[in-house]
Amino acid sequence: MRHLFLALALASVSYFAHSQESFQLTEKSILGLTLTSAPQWDQIEAAFNEAKAQSLEVGDQFRPELFGEAAHNETKEKAIIQFAPVWSPQQNTQLGVRQAFRGGLSASAAFGTDQRSASTPNGRFERISTSSIRVDLQVDLWRDLFGRLSKAQSQSAEFDLKRAEIEREIQQKTFTLGLRRTYWSMVANNEQIKVYEGLKKIALEQLADARKRRAAGVTDDGEVARYEAQVASREGSRLYYLYQRELLMKQLKVLLPELQSKEVALAPYDIPKMIQTVLACTATIASQSSVPMEFTKFDEVTALLRQTQRERTKLASAYDDVDLKFVGGVRTTGVASEGDGNGNYTGSYDDAFRDWQQNDRTGFSAGLRFTMPLGREKTRETKELYESKRFDAKVKERESEIATTHQQLVKVIALLADVVRSQKENSLALERRLAVQNRKFREARVSVNDLILDQDAYLNSNLVTIQTQLEIINTIFDYLVVFTETPCEFNRI
């Protein structure tokens, strides 16, 4: 029964493993996935939409809005004197529209009604009704004269949105480059595993040969043990790189959840072709004697930062400005209050409307509203300094990144290319030496320790070559993060 259960469990695991859809991993197949399902992609979109929402909020200040209110008040309080009646019930309504404009102007228009009743010792007021139309105007005469501040606020939001659009493109490019980094790390890891598998195979062959020679009495247990240790060492290193591969696979599946249900495996790749593509791209980069501004969008970001800084400084400078406004309004009213000669008055909404149409009760108001802040100079100066410093820091950071990335990475790539050439020459020399050492070992002219030392030197040289090639690729990726429009094949994948 126990064996049956184990067999069923193994069959279930095997079925699950085979039921997973396979996915052949290449640069193009990664980028062909639905990148929009990636969490990091969502974060990029969220950051952009946050900037977009902030820009729209600024624009919403200058959109019309409808407002209104309705109220009913009632009390059982009695009038003490006839000249001061207690109005109950009272009903008030108002409906209107208002809008602020970018020129420092705001206006509103509203229609309202009022109906109330009251009683006094000398009579009764029943449904006394009033209807009114009011138009109000407010003009900024100083602080926002001709829309100086409202325009600065709108333009600042517009520049922020344009910058967010460009930064979204840059971040999306950075994300895809990050996926490609992971892919090439997996390729390098696979090459490292191949190196250790090859050396492990050689070590196993040498171990088998040593055991034969021990059986023939040619060698002793010490040499066999040395080869056994070498096999274990090679296997341990191979398992370590297999562990690294699983970590890279986990990293890739975290970046692309679409791969979580798939059995992912590296598709065949062409390293010589990749090297030629990389070298062609490095040649394009190295051919630029000066910083190729046409290859980057960072300069557009810095220009927009400067424009935003200018508008934000205007807003900060107005913090303690005098606030002087003209306020005016026009109102026309209709009243319904018909007396019967006995101290009783009645009215209705209809009568109020008719009175409004038949009698001109138009009135107007005009005035100035003045506010002068006192003691806010230090706050204004601090705000101005804050806007100046924070934008200066962002601009300098971008400008430095543009210049340094081109100047230094060109040198770094050249140095790494020299390292690869040197390592290849070193590997070829070590390969020739290893062949000689193997022959000498078979002739009993060198010790097993000397042979293993030469094998380790050859191994390390190959590993360094692989790692350096990966460094070149990552360095180019660093360059393409800034110079996203570099015209080379490696950047068009």
Describe each region flagged by the PLM:
Residues 12-14:
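N-terminal signal peptide c-region/cleavage motif recognized by signal peptidases
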Residues 70-139, 272-280, 314, 327-374, ...:
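Small/polar, glycine/serine/threonine/aspartate-rich low-complexity segments that form flexible
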Residues 42-46, 59, 102-127, 142-167, ...:
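Sec/SRP-type N-terminal targeting helices
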Residues 25, 159, 165-293, 412, ...:
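Periplasmic alpha-helical coiled-coil/stalk elements that build and connect Gram-negative outer-membrane
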Residues 6, 18, 76, 240, ...:
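Acidic, low-complexity, intrinsically disordered peripheral segments
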Residues 3, 61-65, 102-104, 132, ...:
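Strand-connecting loop/turn motifs
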Residues 19-92, 142-152, 156-158, 165-166, ...:
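Bacterial Sec-pathway N-terminal export signals of envelope proteins
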Residues 41-58, 171-198, 205-207, 230-231, ...:
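Amphipathic alpha-helical coiled-coil segments
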